[in-house]
Amino acid sequence: MGRAYQNKKDSMAKTAGAKTKVYSKYGKEIYICAKNGGTDPDGNLSLRRLIERAKKDQVPAHVIDRAIDKAKGGGGEDYVATRYEGYGPGNCMIIVDCLTDNNKRTFADVRVCFTKANAKIGAQNSVSHLFDHLAIFVFDGDDDETVLEALMMADVDVTDVEVENGKVTVFAPHTEYNNTRTALEEMGVTEFDEDLISFVPQIAAPIEGEDVEVMERFLAMLEDCDDVQNVYHNAEF
C-alpha cells in the first residue's frame, strides 16, 4: 500500500493550486470546524490540528484568525460537504470533494468540467468504493514493528505500517485520524512529512497520449472551481 501511495501521490492526492486557492480551502475548513466544534483550539482537537496543517502549508495567521472570528460571530454561510464521482480520460476514476453554500451552483460548475473533459459523472459510491479513505502519516523512523505495537496498545485501528528509505508511513481509517496522531505524538513523533486524510486508489489506471493532456486540463479546471476542496483519482501518467 505504501509504495502504491508514494507512486501515485503526485497525481491522485489532493491538488494544491495557487496560494489563494489554498487559503480559501483552509479558511472554509477552519470556519466549519470552529463553528461546529468550538472556536478554542485547546478544546477542539480537530481545530487545533487543522490549524497546524494550515500553518505547515504556509497559510497566513490573518486567514486563520479571520475564519475563527467569523465562526465566533455566528451566522455566516452554512457550508455543506458534497461529493461527486465519475470517470475521466482513459476511464480513470475521479472523486471531487466540495464545500458549498449553493449545491446547484457547485454541481453546474463541476458538470462543466466533466463535460469539457468528455468525462462522466456517476452516482454516489460509483467509484469511491474502489478507493480506501485513509488517514496517512509519514515521519522519520526505521522501526515499523515498534510503531505498530504502540498504536495497537493505544487501541488504534491501524490499516498498515511500512518503512522505506528511513521513513515510516502509517495508514489508518480516516475516522481514526485523531486517535492515530495522538498515539504517535505520545510516542514522541513531533514532525510529520505527511499528515492528511486522503482517498487512495486500490487499482491504478494508466493513461497515455491525448488522455494525459485532457486529464491535466480536467484537473486544472476542477482546481479553478471555488467550491472544490480536494480532487482524487487513480490515473497513472
From Swiss-Prot:
InterPro entries: Integrase-like_N, TACO1_YebC-like_2nd/3rd_dom, TACO1_YebC_N, Transcrip_reg_TACO1-like, Transcrip_reg_TACO1-like_dom3, YebC-like. GO terms for cellular component: cytosol. It is found in: Cytoplasm. Signal peptide: none annotated. The keyword DNA-binding applies. It holds the Pfam family TACO1_YebC_N. GO terms for biological process: regulation of DNA-templated transcription. Keywords: Cytoplasm, DNA-binding, Transcription, Transcription regulation. SUPFAM superfamilies: YebC-like (SSF75625). GO terms for molecular function: DNA binding. Its main location: cytoplasm. The keyword DNA-binding applies. HAMAP family: Transcrip_reg_TACO1 (MF_00693). Belongs to the TACO1 family. This is Probable transcriptional regulatory protein PSHAa1370. It comes from Pseudoalteromonas translucida (strain TAC 125).
